[in-house]
Amino acid sequence: MSRLLVPLVCAAALAACDSDSDREVALRFAPVVGDQPFACGEDFDGIGSGASTVTPLDFRMYVHEVALLRSSGERVPVAIRDDGQWQSEGLVLLDFEDGSGACMTGSPATNFEVRGNVPDHGDYVGVEFIVGVPHEQNHLDGAIAPAPLNAQGMWWTWQGGYKYVRLDMRPSTQSEFFYHLGATNCDGSVQDGFECAYANLPSVRIDGFDPGRDTIVVDAAKILAGVDVDHVPDGVKDTLPGCMAFPGDPECPAMMAPLGLRFEDNAPAGVQTVFSARARGGE
């Protein structure tokens, strides 16, 4: 090879190594209830502080601001691909229920992935995302909003916004036990805009995550761990089974803490425990 060509070849090789060309990425979420895969039509034992048996009714959530973390600490946003159904403008609806069994509020369609593009680096070691809907999208009119904001059952009428997380279960003592998370203490209108005292947007960071090999586990049992799902409300101090973030709701502190939130307080509550990483071979 000519001596003149050697530097050019080396320079080309170095440029290829430093290339910022994109690659497709699919971040897989695996919903579980304790050590069992989440599934409509199944019963799950040992749930909550009373070790109760529950049947799933619904399990969905929105996520946004998804990013991968490099070994250097650099945060690399995932360019979410709009698909007209689950993903739009950086917002993704994860839908774990399939409309079977007791999951009658949903539909057969499901979505377990966040799909997009990232620079083709080889040193991604973590993932970050925010659970919920950004403020600027949260108070659109759910009746005419585009997908995925038009999902049936995810519009939170009493707050004029969306349910960031919807986890509904049926215990043995009552027909439903709810967990509906969203922005609360909101004033305003869809036309004029809203201001909310509590954003309730959990920020999640998972270290030791390889997007090519690992799955993001979402454990519903962690959300329910600190409450007795068989407890029947007295209609006075506790008006609804579960947590819908009503002012003074007694179940909410224990159900929001696993997502790193404090009830009726914007200060963080600590490290979230609902999301973790697992090798895909362990699914």
Where do the PLM segments sit?
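A short, solvent-exposed, low-complexity linear motif enriched for acidic/polar residues
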Residues: 19-283
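Bacterial N-terminal signal peptides that target proteins for export
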Residues: 1-6
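C-terminal motif of bacterial Sec signal peptides marking the signal peptidase cleavage site
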Residues: 13-16
